[in-house]
Amino acid sequence: MPRHSRRYQEIRQKVDRTRFYSVDDAIELVKQTATAKFDETVELHLSTNIDTKRPEQQVRSTVTLPHGTGKRVRVLVFAKGDKAEAAKNAGADYVGGDELVEKITNENFTDFDVAIATPDMMRSIGKLGKILGPRGLMPSPKSGTVTEDVETAVKAFKMGRIEVRNDKTGCIHIPVGKCSFDGEKLRENLLSAYRQIIALRPAGVKGQFIKRVVLSSTMGVGIKIDQSDLENI
């Protein structure tokens, strides 16, 4: 069995693994147990009841956090002409057409967090699937990253829109802020993210969509949240 550090063991002792905490108590506890030397990210983990073998039950979309994630988001845009200028003016970090495709192909360049593309660029960037796909960076209409309105998309991702998708086990992991955020901002981000995911429930899912809700910091332990508290707020 893996041996955990003394710090991890001390954190674990503060969390009752059998208890389901209220939203406010979970946020307070995650802040108390975040003792790393950097500003840890607060992460919301949602265990869903989707059948990951069925394509129509995959969850892939975006959620917008009212207070952002606390992280500087690096946005790359594949566009030409006026669209490229609009992306630059909106604050995109990297903008280009075929030359940007070649840079990624030749240099394996992935020093960005979000990739947006205009529809006319999709044929050119199709060959980047093997590089961008595994990193979750491939533009997709489902995630709002293939669009003519690159200006709005760039601003939205810069201000707090994030891509979400389920993993192979059906879990969805969402950063909802930093431990340095005050409790109210974390609360509003968490509730907003949860409600937006609930609205994305695939039609074919049977029974309860969200089976378990857990909150943690980057280096912390999982804190289970009472879903009835989430539903009643």
Curated annotation (Swiss-Prot):
The record ties this protein, via InterPro entries, to: Ribosom_uL1_bac-type, Ribosomal_uL1, Ribosomal_uL1-like, Ribosomal_uL1/biogenesis, Ribosomal_uL1_3-a/b-sand, Ribosomal_uL1_CS
Q: Which UniProt keywords apply?
A: Repressor, Ribonucleoprotein, Ribosomal protein, RNA-binding, rRNA-binding, Translation regulation, tRNA-binding
- Molecular-function GO terms, alphabetical: rRNA binding; structural constituent of ribosome; tRNA binding
Keyword Repressor appears in the UniProt entry: yes
Family the entry assigns: Belongs to the universal ribosomal protein uL1 family.
Q: What does this protein do?
A: Binds directly to 23S rRNA. The L1 stalk is quite mobile in the ribosome, and is involved in E site tRNA release.
Question: Per its record, how is this protein called by name?
Answer: Large ribosomal subunit protein uL1
Q: Which gene encodes it?
A: rplA
